């Protein structure tokens, strides 16, 4: 394709709010154009990359007998009300009304709709298992879209749904999909790691995320260097081994702590280590207030709280709620209280006595507080995030951290949707059973961004061969010169029969062409320049920067060999 005919609006400067390198490079190289916050158009080069990604996805889905369909993005509210997610999903669900006042949602996911499609069709165990997938735009009303395609309000996704007669069948499809995802991310050029994860609003009993390792990743991965252990930090279990630091029990004292609001400020004020401070936070669980205690250097993990209490209806109490409940602001909270409120403490609080806690009065704290004498703990549990260097639950070693971008996730849904939506089949005994389900997602547009995040240098993108928008970049330095133009035209005609070629025939300065070529990042470059009359051209590899002069008689052999050896 001739570059003069392709819409590639490269940029010299990018908006300052473009923080991620992938966001900056996708804008700068003319692959995407922002419409408004979190919404982008995919321009010709990006569309070609997306087509290459989706071709790989389709191949791997068909390899495991997953069948492609296409469902509407617009979904009626009644389906979401059946599953209970219309109210539970929250403000991220984009809702709208038609002219008749009927409620709809622009789908962020399609569990309800696909269940409604199959519930009157998959009637017998003989029709199972069945796996359906689609590739489609999804919508989520992100509060703060950021990092370009990594967290947008409209995004492209591959979502698949499987239906089974028994758990063994689900386990097999889950494993097949897990392996397919591993192959997909390897083929598109992403270093992705599967990690144990939380199922979030989708639900289900078991899930893995596929994380593309990246410094700008919004998720923290906990992993072992001694085993295959890897988990999202939200799910990483903290191993409790008692390490009591008990001292002689001291009398309770109330002390003035002016302008002290955080655990670290309190530790500094008292001249004590922050891990000897105990923080108190108030949560509302299914409408009931509870207190949760952790040591000063630990952070409460609300995902673990949701798992512990078996509900998603958990939220941190607001400042007004806290003041109305205990008469003090959040920085002064403590468990010594004359109100009926259940108290839960992280396991590691047990290691301390003579605690330092808030006095439930602004500007004051209590020291030498002791469990049993001054307050009681209803239950202890693992309520916090793991720290780097702590022991891992598989016994393999200690926790190491890395950042990652979630590019895919697989779920075992069980009967969460089929039971609520009455999707049943007859088993081999003729009894009605709820369909057992799995769901599996890949962020296609997010994968595009993750590829760029992992494959770039200071000059631009470095596309992996499998997804590159074109194989070769043919550049005529000065098309006004007959020998250069004629040779470049001839090479374009020859190589275009075997490779996808982007032919830069523009009337631009050589520096502009070379800068754009580096920015766009095609794997191989052929430059027709001053030695065109001798039949000599330059061949350059984008990844290594290696270049050599080659006679046109040898050019096809050289290019073919180099292309075959590309990653």
UniProtKB/Swiss-Prot annotation:
The gene is proS. It is found in: Cytoplasm. GO terms for biological process: prolyl-tRNA aminoacylation. Consists of three domains: the N-terminal catalytic domain, the editing domain and the C-terminal anticodon-binding domain. Belongs to the class-II aminoacyl-tRNA synthetase family. ProS type 1 subfamily. It catalyses: tRNA(Pro) + L-proline + ATP = L-prolyl-tRNA(Pro) + AMP + diphosphate. InterPro entries: aa-tRNA-synt_IIb, aa-tRNA-synth_II, aa-tRNA-synth_II/BPL/LPL, Anticodon-bd, Anticodon-bd_dom_sf, Pro-tRNA-ligase_IIa, Pro-tRNA-synth_IIa_bac-type, Pro-tRNA-Synthase_IIa_type1. Coiled coil: none annotated. GO terms for molecular function: aminoacyl-tRNA deacylase activity; ATP binding; catalytic activity, acting on a protein; proline-tRNA ligase activity; transferase activity. This is Proline--tRNA ligase. It is an enzyme of class 6 (ligase). Homodimer. Keywords: Aminoacyl-tRNA synthetase, ATP-binding, Cytoplasm, Ligase, Nucleotide-binding, Protein biosynthesis. One of its GO terms (cellular component) is cytosol. It comes from Staphylococcus aureus (strain NCTC 8325 / PS 47). Catalyzes the attachment of proline to tRNA(Pro) in a two-step reaction: proline is first activated by ATP to form Pro-AMP and then transferred to the acceptor end of tRNA(Pro). As ProRS can inadvertently accommodate and process non-cognate amino acids such as alanine and cysteine, to avoid such errors it has two additional distinct editing activities against alanine. One activity is designated as 'pretransfer' editing and involves the tRNA(Pro)-independent hydrolysis of activated Ala-AMP. Its EC number is 6.1.1.15. PROSITE patterns: AA_TRNA_LIGASE_II.
């Amino acid at each position: 394709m001739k570059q003069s005919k392709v819409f590639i609006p490269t940029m010299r400067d990018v908006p300052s709010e473009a923080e991620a390198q992938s966001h900056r490079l996708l804008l700068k190289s003319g692959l995407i154009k922002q419409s408004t916050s979190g919404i982008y158009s995919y321009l010709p080069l990006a569309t070609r990359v997306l087509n290459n990604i989706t071709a790989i996805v389709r191949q791997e889905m068909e390899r495991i007998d997953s069948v492609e369909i296409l469902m509407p993005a617009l979904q009626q509210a009644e389906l979401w009300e059946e599953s209970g997610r219309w109210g539970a999903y929250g403000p991220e669900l984009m809702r709208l009304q038609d002219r008749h006042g009927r409620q709809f949602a622009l789908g962020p996911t399609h569990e309800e709709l696909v269940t409604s499609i199959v519930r009157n069709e998959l009637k017998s165990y003989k029709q199972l298992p069945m796996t359906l997938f689609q590739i489609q735009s999804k919508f989520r009303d992100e509060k703060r879209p950021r990092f370009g395609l990594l967290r947008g309000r409209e995004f492209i996704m591959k979502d698949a749904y499987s239906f089974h007669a028994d758990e063994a069948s689900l386990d097999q499809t889950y494993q097949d999909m897990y392996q397919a995802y591993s192959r997909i991310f390897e083929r598109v050029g992403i270093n992705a790691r599967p990690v144990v994860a939380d199922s979030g609003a989708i639900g289900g009993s078991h899930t893995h995320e596929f994380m593309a390792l990246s410094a700008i990743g919004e998720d923290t991965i906990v992993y072992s260097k001694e085993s295959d252990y890897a988990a999202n930090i939200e799910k990483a279990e903290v191993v409790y081994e008692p390490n009591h630091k008990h001292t002689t029990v001291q009398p309770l004292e109330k002390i003035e702590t002016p302008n002290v609001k955080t655990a670290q400020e309190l530790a500094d004020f008292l001249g004590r280590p922050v891990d000897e401070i105990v923080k108190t936070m108030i949560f509302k669980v299914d409408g009931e207030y509870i207190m949760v205690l952790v040591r000063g250097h630990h952070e409460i993990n609300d995902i673990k709280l949701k798992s512990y209490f078996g509900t998603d209806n958990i939220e941190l109490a607001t400042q007004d709620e806290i003041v109305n409940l205990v008469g003090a602001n959040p920085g002064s909270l403590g468990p010594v209280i004359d109100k009926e409120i259940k108290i839960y403490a992280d396991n590691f609080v047990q290691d301390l006595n003579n605690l330092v806690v808030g006095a439930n009065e602004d500007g004051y704290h209590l020291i030498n507080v002791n469990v049993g004498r001054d307050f009681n703990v209803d239950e202890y549990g693992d309520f916090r995030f793991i720290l780097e260097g702590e022991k891992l639950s598989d016994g393999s070693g200690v926790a190491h951290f890395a950042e990652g971008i979630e590019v895919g996730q697989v779920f075992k849904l069980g009967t969460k949707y089929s039971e609520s939506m009455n999707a049943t089949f007859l088993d081999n005994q003729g009894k009605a059973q709820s369909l057992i389900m799995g769901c599996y997602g890949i962020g296609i547009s997010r994968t595009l961004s993750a590829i760029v995040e992992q494959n770039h240098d200071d000059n631009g993108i470095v596309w992996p061969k499998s997804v590159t928008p074109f194989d070769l970049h043919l550049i005529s330095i000065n098309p006004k010169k007959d020998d250069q133009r004629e040779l470049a035209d001839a090479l374009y005609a020859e190589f275009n029969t075997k490779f996808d070629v982007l032919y830069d025939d523009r009337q631009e300065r050589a520096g502009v062409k070379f800068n754009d070529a580096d920015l766009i990042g095609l794997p191989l470059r052929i430059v027709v320049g001053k030695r065109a009359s001798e039949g000599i051209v330059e061949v350059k590899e984008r990844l290594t920067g290696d270049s050599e002069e080659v006679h046109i008689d040898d050019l096809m052999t050289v290019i073919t060999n180099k292309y075959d050896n590309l990653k």
